[in-house]
Amino acid sequence: YFTHKSSKTRNYSYYWDVENLVAHWVAYPLNDGLAGSGSRTDDWGLDPKLPRNMQPVLFRGFRGGYDRGHQLPSADRLTREANVQTFYGTNMTPQLGSLNQQGWASFEGDVRDWSRQFDTLYVVTGCMVEGSTKVAYDNDNKAVAVPTAYFKALLGYKKDLSIAASTAG
């Protein structure tokens, strides 16, 4: 797995699948200092942690009608440095536009809203590619597995409460 840091904090960590060219999971914290409705940089780039041939190249998006679906949403990172890292191909999966722009985007907003109830909400977003028979092609014509399912796991922390009380709800 790999971790991206900004100058002041750990941004996110992810577990990379070189064969399918997707992160099985991306883990990140949400709190007042990190999340909000930040402006998108749309600075699509290569992840400096991996060589070009081991990651999707997505300057122009996926071919075949798929959106570049963020696992760590761009809106969850306010600083330019942290936001740029959300546009690496290693944070993307091929998503149908209807899912990416509607249901999943709404769910991401719900998670941001829930994060306000805690000092920190720890989020793990992931995708499943087992059994996938579909691929999308990146700008270098590499095949990227299209996930068959997505998930989010959440853990809320409040410094004034016990662990059981922090995660209830």
What residue ranges belong to the model's regions?
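Domain-level detector for secreted/extracellular nuclease and nuclease-toxin modules, and
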Residues: 1-169
